[in-house]
Amino acid sequence: MADPGSVRVVDEEISLVPYYPNEETALPWYQDPDVCRQVDNIDYVYTSERLNAMYTYLNTHGACYYISYRGVLVGDVSLRNSGELAIVICREYQNRHIGRRCIRAMLDLAREKGMERVTANIYSFNTQSRNMFLSLGFRETGGEWFALEL
């Protein structure tokens, strides 16, 4: 679980804010059918219950942060204790290299935690995310899994 109050500054535009219950802001991200397909390969949107269960799991099994871009919360990023990374950025803020910068910061966090390897599960149709992870040095390890040795 992230240390409350331990905001991680990524750069002058982005900071990672430790998870706190904020359904009003986060639920709309997960009610975009395209985002749900990219992230979970599902054809339905999240309910409040599903959202809260996801965040509870991520926050108790690793570090979970909201992504603040120029003072606006635009998504979330997590690093599970198992080394699995996940990131979601709402559609309006995609294609601004926010994800790339956040994943770099999460790689730093993984190193701080002494992790030797991180992974990401990225669906084959999500070429945007696959390309971003590959550009950061991740390699396909089979199926829809990618890994980076730290």
Predicted regions and their residues:
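A short, well-structured alpha-helix characteristic of acyl/acetyltransferase catalytic modules
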Residues: 1-48, 52-56
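Hydrophobic adenine-recognition pocket in adenosine-nucleotide-binding enzymes
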Residues: 19, 89, 122
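Acetyl-CoA-dependent GNAT
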Residues: 41-92, 149
